[in-house]
Amino acid sequence: MANSSPVYDWFQERLEIQDIADDISSKYVPPHVNIFYCLGGITLVCFLIQFATGFAMTFYYKPTVAEAYSSVQYLMTDVSFGWLIRSVHRWSASMMVLMLILHVFRVYLTGGFKRPRELTWVTGVTMAVITVSFGVTGYSLPWDQVGYWAVKIVSGVPAAIPVVGDFMVELLRGGESVGQSTLTRFYSLHTFVMPWLLAVFMLMHFLMIRKQGISGPL
């Protein structure tokens, strides 16, 4: 590269970053690709917004049944731009689910799930399940009346499963009833377990797309 900087030359010598950039920028894009093929990328952007705003809220949120609601109120009323951070988090969550649904429909209607892209489809469906689980766990964190009863209903659903139903309910709730252990588990799932799971499946998903390319037209 002409007129390159010393910093660029230092990285180029060690990592060959120009070859990486050329490989990314020269990937063939089929002529049938249109704006609807951007829905997956928009979903990723929504996830990144979720991650950033969620991380910011962890500085103020207190995952206890006694202080969860008041900490959310403090974030909304006393923290500078706290209302904006939480509002962006909520709206981007809704947008992420909407974009995900549209993306799934686009892939299905254009046959993007067919051989040899079955595993790409499986990882995508897995991410869809994780995304919905994000909504269920996040809904409970303010620990208001809506959140409490939502957790009570959702965590009680597995009771209908034969043999292991009661065990699954107790596992979700952290005991026989909804309480502090339930909130702690949902907070852990929402802020640590699920983000890592989603990141891993996203990486697998993108690597498969990178390897196999975009599916052709119907």
UniProtKB/Swiss-Prot annotation:
InterPro entries the record matches: Cyt_b/b6_N, Cyt_B6_PetB, Cytb/b6-like_sf, Cytochrome_b_N_euk/bac, Di-haem_cyt_TM
Membrane topology, record value: Multi-pass membrane protein
One Pfam family here: Cytochrome_B
Record-level Gene Ontology MF annotations: electron transporter, transferring electrons within cytochrome b6/f complex of photosystem II activity; metal ion binding; oxidoreductase activity
List of residues binding heme c: 38
Main location: membrane
Recorded superkingdom: Bacteria
Record GO cellular component, one term: plasma membrane-derived thylakoid membrane
Cofactor notes: Binds 2 heme b groups non-covalently with two histidine residues as axial ligands.
Residues reported to bind heme b 2: 89, 190
GO terms for biological process, alphabetical: photosynthesis; respiratory electron transport chain
Transmembrane segments: 35-55, 93-113, 119-139, 189-209
Alphabetically ordered keywords of this record: Electron transport, Heme, Iron, Membrane, Metal-binding, Photosynthesis, Thylakoid, Transmembrane, Transmembrane helix, Transport
Cofactors demanded by this protein: heme b; heme c
Binding site for heme b 1: 103, 205
Location in the cell: Cellular thylakoid membrane
Disulfide bridge positions per record: none
Subunit comment: The 4 large subunits of the cytochrome b6-f complex are cytochrome b6, subunit IV (17 kDa polypeptide, PetD), cytochrome f and the Rieske protein, while the 4 small subunits are PetG, PetL, PetM and PetN. The complex functions as a dimer.
Family: Belongs to the cytochrome b family. PetB subfamily.
Comment field (misc): Heme 1 (or BH or b566) is high-potential and absorbs at about 566 nm, and heme 2 (or BL or b562) is low-potential and absorbs at about 562 nm.
Job of this protein: Component of the cytochrome b6-f complex, which mediates electron transfer between photosystem II (PSII) and photosystem I (PSI), cyclic electron flow around PSI, and state transitions.
PANTHER family according to UniProt: CYTOCHROME B
Name of the protein this chain belongs to: Cytochrome b6
